[in-house]
Amino acid sequence: MFDIVIRGGVIHRGDGEAPVEADIAIKDGVIVQIGNDLGPAGRVIDATGQIVTPGFIDIHTHYDGQASWDPELRPSIDHGVTTAVMGNCGVGFAPVREGDRETLIKLMEGVEDIPGTALYEGLTWEWESFPDYLDALEKMPRTIDIAAMVPHDPLRVYVMGERAVFSEPANENDISEMRRLTREALEAGAIGFATGRSDVHKTADGDWTPSSEATRDELTGIARAFAGLDFGVVQAVSDFNLERGEQDFDEEWQIVADYAKASGRPFSFSLMQRDFAPEQWVKLTKLSEELKQEGVDARMQVAPRAIGVFLGFNCTFHPFMGYPSYKTIADLPLAERVAKMKTPEFKAQILSEKTDKVSGPGSSVPPLADLLLEHIELVAEKFFQLGDPPDYEQPPENSLASKARAKGVSIYEMIYDTLLERDGQELIYLPLYNYTELNYDNVLKMMEHPQALYGLSDGGAHVGTVCDASMPTYMITHWTRDRKRGRRLDLPRVIRMLTGAQADYLGMRDRGYIREGMRADLNVIDVAALQLEPPYMKQDLPAGGQRLLQGARGYTATIVAGDVVMEEGQLTGAKPGRLYRAGRAQAIAAE
């Protein structure tokens, strides 16, 4: 008898080919048979009129801290993700000496907007080395699988101490030791190595990240830790010295390219369109094509929508938080704040005021927020009321600036009234990247590039302003069904981007496809009913910290290693997820 049989579903195998209608039998966590009229099972899932897909693989998350205390890893599990890769952008929590723990917390707080108070209370610190960290992660039963890359920042701090924090160049001994520790981590099961070189990434104190100015010798020296290995990937995030000029751009690209070449492994970097350099992404795609022609398996991580932030009264930032009148009520519960703000007297008072600075020492708000406030009338051309259901590709006439002009009110009043809707829980969406032309035509071009990978969800990060772990659901609903402002994508292609293509890049040979003998990581989805819900704030992080979550309707079941972990939007309590150890997993899959 089989453990589970999924009957009558339309199977998307993860290979991008046309789907087929068939049944799937699962036994001992593995897909054992695909066909019709399969034998009896302990449980039958009726998938008639629905699709069955491999479990989604998210290659770009930041659950590095959360994974040590949270077995569920929401919101990723809410959107069909069965494997999440963390350690991206070079930030993480291992290796670490006891005296450097605060440094790494401030780094993660600043770069990825994860509350330091939650990290201080939640992190278990059962490790020093990276292999220790993997062992600690392995102890916890969890809902989905996780895999971890070696992050450059903690590695540099571990080897160089304060010299790393002050961005001193690494010497030969430093590089040799970082290479040795990276190799040690890879042999223990790390799935790769990641570095961060973005000028916008700063610590909570406003300092540069330790790896942001690492030299070519350092990066290529560490990358040679992969010599002789047949597994592992390397990742980088960089803005390629965008604001420093063309010569600096070319030099930065060459450093990153040399790093990729030295590793001999598949390489990916983040690709997005920035308003102040709207054609840079095109140049990067061409350079990536050239790098591939040189023999590097070069990929570009792309997002299926804008990289944006939410503004709201419970979010990390909203436009009125620096106003004197608002500060007098800022600590009140939301309902009391809303009641006060709805009074004509309070509204008139606050709209007569000017804002104070909101960033600076002790503030979780980045300096970018003050820049936005200085130019809010211009920025508001890209302020959109998210709505229910959420709409991430809205036309210019829907912007709050356009609505304010049409209504004959100031942009400040328009923002004020909008944020008070839904009892103060309404969100304003500000697409920062990928929305220069106020549509997703360029996003479509990125997604269709043969070297594109779905990425950049940042699951677990930017918890007070972003909830892009919902992107897998959005890829299906928007790009295959709902888009009205341009061309769509075929469903088999989108499913492949979420599954088989990810597994191929990562070298995960036991998942990503629906085939006999593969691990039974699966989604049963009612595509007609599939719908994103609005993001909402939940106060469930350690130390009372809050984060944005986002649900979805239409996932009938999510299965991990043969166990149903999510059913009709509810966790079942099953925890079959584990730490994926690269190298070891590849060896088992090859047997």
Q: What does each model-found stretch correspond to?
A:
Residues 12-23, 427-437, 443, 490-493, ...:
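Acidic, glycine-enriched loop/beta-strand segments at the rims
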Residues 9, 29, 49, 60, ...:
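Divalent metal-coordination and catalytic microenvironments
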Residues 69-192, 228-229:
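Divalent-metal coordination cores built from histidine and acidic residues
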Residues 2-4, 10-55, 535:
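Histidine-rich, glycine-flanked metal-binding segment
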Residues 413-419, 490-499, 514:
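Short, well-structured alpha-helical segments that form the helix of a local strand-helix-strand
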Residues 367-368, 445-452, 469, 524-570, ...:
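C-terminal cap of metal-dependent C-N hydrolases
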Residues 133-137, 143, 149-159, 168-172, ...:
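Active-site neighborhoods of metal-dependent hydrolases
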